[in-house]
């Protein structure tokens, strides 16, 4: 191993690092970013960062090897062109939603697929997932379901009190 080029060692480290990230992530989405400006990519990175997600741009060969090492399948024929991987560490839908919003805003951004719950998701499934509210939105919906009956009782009691007060 003494004659191994430093670039090969570096690439192996990149593959191992990315494979670990993919294994520990909740979900990730692969998309072709060709045509996005630096400002667009920075804005996407900021949105992803706010939900504890990250954007990685790697060579396709390194990405393919990381997928293989992490046990990810479904992207075998998808890694052509300049691709990026948005990885969600906490909220499963956050990265998928952010990239899907960018793809809807810019027609030239092509989503290749996503990986969620150890399954490949195609673009049709991604559209369905992106329609789901985020974790905070779901919490607020759940909270409103709990508070609605109490609110109705309060309004009823207030109406009865007003009638008796007249």
Curated annotation (Swiss-Prot):
What keywords sit in the KW lines? Ribonucleoprotein, Ribosomal protein, RNA-binding, rRNA-binding
What is a single molecular function from GO for this protein? structural constituent of ribosome
Gene Ontology annotations for the cellular component aspect, listed alphabetically: large ribosomal subunit
- Please give the start and end residues of each transmembrane region: none
InterPro entries, alphabetically? Ribosomal_uL10, Ribosomal_uL10-like_sf, Ribosomal_uL10_bac, Ribosomal_uL10_bac_type, Ribosomal_uL10_CS_bac
Cited CDD domains: Ribosomal_L10
Q: Does the keyword RNA-binding apply?
A: yes
Q: What GO biological process, any one, is recorded here? A: translation
Protein's job: Forms part of the ribosomal stalk, playing a central role in the interaction of the ribosome with GTP-bound translation factors.
Question: What does the subunit section of this Swiss-Prot or TrEMBL entry state?
Answer: Part of the ribosomal stalk of the 50S ribosomal subunit. The N-terminus interacts with L11 and the large rRNA to form the base of the stalk. The C-terminus forms an elongated spine to which L12 dimers bind in a sequential fashion forming a multimeric L10(L12)X complex.
Q: Which family does it belong to?
A: Belongs to the universal ribosomal protein uL10 family.
NCBIfam families membership: PRK00099.1-1
Write down what this protein is called: Large ribosomal subunit protein uL10
Q: Which gene encodes it?
A: rplJ
